[in-house]
Amino acid sequence: MKMTTTLMATSAIVMAGTSAFADAHMASEMTIVSWGGAYSASQQAAYHDPYSEMTGVTIINDESSAEAVAKLRAMSEAGNVTWDVVDVVASDAIRLCDEGLALEIDADTQLADGDDGSTASEDFGDLLVSDCFIPQIVYSTTAGYRTDLVGDTPPTSICAMFDLETYPGMRSLEKRPINNMEWALLCDGVAKADVYDVLETEEGQAQAFAKLDTIKDNVVWWSAGADTPQLLADGEVVMGTTYNGRLFALIEEQKQPVGMLWDAQVFDLDGWIIPTGLSPEREARALDYVKFATDTQRLADQAKYISYGPARASSAPLVGQHATLGIDMAQHMPTDPENAKNTFLYNYEWWADYRDDLDAKFQAWLSQ
């Protein structure tokens, strides 16, 4: 488990208009779980450091979000929940909420109002997909490719992933069914609107696996978001999927010969949950943190460091330039109209219902 500890401020500063940050009834240390890499770095700069400076709280970072559901189940069963705030995708939040492993949140009484005068529920709108989920960012899983390895006809469709004749070489895909199953069906002729109806059937699942079979021997399977950027940088794959923020860092910050393929990018939501089973002091601290970290300004601040769209409507007008590169960030967001011409909308509720079953089938397919 990879952990780093933020520097503890020497004194607490209580700011007007916020909750009582120095309340003696709140824990003085908290463990926040996220995904690592550029994303965790953006959270550190936009949320963790300012909160620690104001409160004196020590924040311990744990990069285990990919295993959040399994680990929280195990912690709950053991009666020893060691995490305080956990960053999860929306479908995992729904599962954790349904299983009673995540705390229910009343957005309008426990989260900050928008800077434009809107209530939290109005500001987040349809992104409040679960009673336990506090939205943070809109991101996408999309594809990148080596510009020097694709010849004179760079790919314009996600289906290039399945075209070994035009684009020979290795690919990298995430080691899970989500997104891969949807893209496989789309590239096998299934209409976008019908994908989940087809995938719900045994025949549809077989169709998706058959399409993935056509490239299986040419795939490097990744588990960490940093894997595909490294594989692309090293020239070990000609194309691969990852989170759009990872590709932004590879292209704009590292200046690698990589292009972004926005076609059929899969929109997803990421946000916070607070585990059930915390002591009153730890729960109070966690609630205080998420209220701070998801206010209008903080969500806009995160966009200075990574190209993920803030979940609050009131934050969008405040998105400006990258903190160090000085480039306009709006055009690098997955929600930018030019980038969002052909998107695929991830069905959170569907995956919450079918994830365990398809995870097992996907792992069985990989082992064949």
Residue ranges, per PLM feature:
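Gram-negative bacterial Sec-dependent N-terminal signal peptides
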Residues: M1-A22
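Early extracytoplasmic/lumenal segment of secretory-pathway proteins
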Residues: A24-R95
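Extracytoplasmic ligand-binding site segments that recognize negatively charged/polar headgroups
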Residues: G37-Q44, T82-W83, D87-D227
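A ligand-binding cleft/hinge motif common to bilobed small-molecule-binding domains
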Residues: A93-R95, M239-P257
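A bilobed periplasmic-binding-protein/Venus flytrap-type ligand-binding module shared by bacterial periplasmic
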Residues: T142-L149, L185-L186, L269-R282, D301-K304
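Periplasmic-binding protein-like
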Residues: Q205-T214, E253-T276
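Mature extracytoplasmic/periplasmic domains
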Residues: P275-N342
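Conserved C-terminal helix/tail region of periplasmic/extracytoplasmic solute-binding proteins
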Residues: T335-Q368
